[in-house]
């Protein structure tokens, strides 16, 4: 673990009067294991010499002032690279000129070949995973068996290509035996196969990376499955077998057929007779109800006439007679 040392005015580099520094890289990290040295050598209250403020082996700092102000950088002498960069621990390329771009100067050392300007072969991590040595660079001390330098493994390789190749690589190597595009016997065969797995997804496999960890690689469909599908498709072409039962052949001149027909006719006659009897009963009841209705209507008319007669009689009586009569 590392802890951040507090800002110190003496730690800031000396800049020209007309220069305004915009860098924020003056953070110096100090290891916890060197904390005892601070107790043995306490810091002075005032300013310290420049020899005490130099960057140690356990520290690193990048000066961005040449990129921010090229005119001020041209006036200052070029500083030697820190010892950590010479040892190969940290990648800190020195500025070649003040007017160059920061990114171009940063990646200048990355693309320089160690063997005479030849660009390294950027292959996938599947080569190192399966251990396919490269014929041209397999015996070089500074190159890994995967045909690319160690800094490429850390920075240039994308870990997305590991899952599909690790699952599908051994099964593909067993199937591919011949040279050329079909066999893939070259040391880059597994790389091409792992890359094609992400470019074109064959039928029967999913293109999603979350489901690409299946143990079996996609291949030709099983003949048993194709036959089952063909049989299933053929079953829907025709009607079900239950509807194709042949009718039982009966001889119309046989005694059994005649007896059956006679029983059927008797049952039909009985049902018809019952229906006729119900119809007759319903008609008879309708006639009875109609006669009762007529009788009641005649009685209502008779009572209405009697009521009208009584009203006329009461109207003809004199008023003193009606007043002397007792009221019920």
From Swiss-Prot:
Disulfide bond sites: none
Keywords assigned by UniProt, alphabetized: Activator, DNA-binding, Methylation, Nucleus, Phosphoprotein, Transcription, Transcription regulation
Region (Basic motif): 258-278
GO BP field: cellular response to amino acid stimulus; defense response to bacterium; fat cell differentiation; hepatocyte proliferation; intrinsic apoptotic signaling pathway in response to endoplasmic reticulum stress; liver regeneration; negative regulation of DNA-templated transcription; negative regulation of neuron apoptotic process
Region (Disordered): 165-274
PTM field: Methylated. Methylation at Arg-3 by CARM1 and at Lys-39 by EHMT2, inhibit transactivation activity. Methylation is probably inhibited by phosphorylation at Thr-220.
Superkingdom classification of source: Eukaryota
GO cellular component terms, A-Z: C/EBP complex; CHOP-C/EBP complex; chromatin; condensed chromosome, centromeric region; cytoplasm; nuclear matrix; nucleoplasm; nucleus
Residues recorded with modification Asymmetric dimethylarginine: 3
Pfam families cross-referenced by the UniProt entry: bZIP_2
Chain spans, region Leucine-zipper: 280-287
Post-translational modification Phosphothreonine, affected residues: 220
Signal sequence bounds: none
GO molecular function: chromatin DNA binding; cis-regulatory region sequence-specific DNA binding; DNA-binding transcription activator activity, RNA polymerase II-specific; DNA-binding transcription factor activity, RNA polymerase II-specific; histone acetyltransferase binding; histone deacetylase binding; identical protein binding; kinase binding
N6-methylated lysine PTM sites in chain numbering: 39
Principal location listed in the UniProt entry: nucleus
Subcellular location, record wording: Nucleus
Domain bZIP: 254-317
Biased composition (Low complexity): 200-231
PROSITE patterns from the UniProt entry: BZIP
PANTHER family assigned: CCAAT/ENHANCER BINDING PROTEIN, CCAAT_ENHANCER-BINDING PROTEIN BETA
Quaternary structure annotation from Swiss-Prot or TrEMBL: Binds DNA as a dimer. Interacts (not methylated) with MED23, MED26, SMARCA2, SMARCB1 and SMARCC1.
Function: Important transcriptional activator regulating the expression of genes involved in immune and inflammatory responses. Binds to regulatory regions of several acute-phase and cytokines genes and probably plays a role in the regulation of acute-phase reaction, inflammation and hemopoiesis. The consensus recognition site is 5'-T[TG]NNGNAA[TG]-3'. Functions in brown adipose tissue (BAT) differentiation. Regulates the transcriptional induction of peroxisome proliferator-activated receptor gamma (PPARG). Binds to the MGF and MIM-1 promoters and activates the transcription of these genes.
Entry similarity comment: Belongs to the bZIP family. C/EBP subfamily.
Protein name: CCAAT/enhancer-binding protein beta
């Amino acid at each position: 673990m590392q802890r951040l040392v507090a800002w110190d005015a003496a730690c800031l580099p000396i800049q020209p009067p007309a220069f305004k520094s915009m860098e924020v890289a003056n953070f110096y990290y100090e290891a916890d294991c060197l904390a005892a040295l601070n107790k043995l050598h306490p810091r002075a209250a005032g300013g310290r010499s420049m020899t005490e403020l130099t960057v140690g082996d356990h520290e690193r700092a990048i000066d961005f002032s040449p990129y921010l102000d090229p005119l001020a950088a041209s006036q200052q002498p070029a500083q030697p690279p820190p010892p950590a960069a010479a040892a190969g621990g940290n990648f800190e390329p020195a500025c070649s000129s003040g007017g160059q771009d920061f990114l171009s100067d940063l990646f200048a050392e990355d693309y320089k070949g160690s063997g005479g300007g030849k660009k390294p072969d950027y292959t996938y991590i599947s080569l190192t995973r399966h251990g396919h040595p490269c014929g041209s660079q397999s015996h070089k001390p500074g190159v890994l068996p995967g045909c690319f330098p160690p800094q490429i493994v850390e920075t240039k390789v994308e870990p997305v290509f590991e899952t599909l190749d690790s699952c599908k690589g051994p099964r593909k190597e067993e199937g591919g035996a011949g040279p050329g595009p079909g066999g893939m016997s070259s040391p880059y065969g597994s790389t091409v196969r792992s890359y094609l797995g992400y470019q074109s997804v064959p039928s029967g496999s999913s293109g999603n990376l979350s489901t690409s960890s299946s143990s079996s690689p996609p291949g030709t469909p099983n003949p048993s499955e194709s036959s089952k599908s063909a049989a299933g498709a053929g079953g829907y072409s025709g009607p079900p077998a239950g509807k194709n039962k042949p009718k039982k052949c009966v001889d119309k001149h046989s005694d059994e057929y005649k007896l059956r027909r006679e029983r059927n006719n008797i049952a039909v006659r009985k049902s018809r007779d019952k229906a006729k009897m119900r119809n007759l009963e319903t008609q008879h009841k309708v006639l009875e109800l109609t006669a009762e209705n007529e009788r009641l209507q005649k009685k209502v008319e008779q009572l209405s006439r009697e009521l009208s007669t009584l009203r006329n009689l009461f109207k003809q009586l004199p008023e003193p007679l009606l007043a002397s009569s007792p009221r019920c």
